[in-house]
Amino acid sequence: MKLFKVVALTVVLIMVVALLVLRMTGLPPGHPSAEDYMTAGRSARPGLWLKGEVVREAVTNWDWVSQFGDAFAENGSELETRTWYGIPHSVTVLLVPRGEELYLMSSAQTFRLGRAFPDGKAWWRNVERDPRVRLKIGGEIYEMTAVLVRDRAEVARLRGGRDPIVRSIDDNGNEYVSEEWHYWRVFQRNIPEYDSGMTAGASD
């Protein structure tokens, strides 16, 4: 019993030290190739803390974000969400810039379609519980608040008129839902307003 306690304590200490190191160094999510992503069942290794210089200036035009729009590239944009157990969960994400507005988009496909929103992805659940997120774009960190776009017509507009519920036909001629798209509007937080000096968005 004494040996078991020593081993257990050693394992706990190693885990604590490892987490402290990762808190300082960061652990970004994996950036697999498109082929590897599909082979892994449309999944990629999640990360923990994202590291980078935090941007404190308000962004008035997000169109430049398009250059980081390839989620499979090493410079793809990343999202850090807050878990209930206190250790961040980060993933690569697809961003949709619309001038002064910025959106996140994500889809449920294959096995995830069998789960009700937001249970299809861990980060969806995290954002629904706590909308305070951090985006890493071009090596810099943006503290944001993510708000789900619940209006299906608005999501269709963001998708260029395409329905967020995508239907396909199987080999037997039967129609089925093959994709379900979700969008979040993201707002900067902890940013001084231009004139009032107040802080924009929710604070930590």
Predicted regions and their residues:
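N-terminal Sec-pathway targeting helices
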Residues: M1-V17
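Membrane-interface motif at the C-terminal end of an N-terminal transmembrane signal
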Residues: I14-A34
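Short N-terminal helix-initiation segments at or just after the protein's N-terminus
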Residues: L22, G26, G69-T83, V127, ...
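Short, conserved active-site entrance elements at the starts or edges of catalytic domains
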Residues: L27-P88
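Short, structured beta-strand-loop surface elements
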Residues: T39-V54, T110-D204
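Generic detector of short, locally flexible boundary/turn motifs and exposed helical patches
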Residues: S43-A44, R56-F72, G99-Y103, A108-L113, ...
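Short beta-strand segments
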Residues: E74-A116, E143-M144
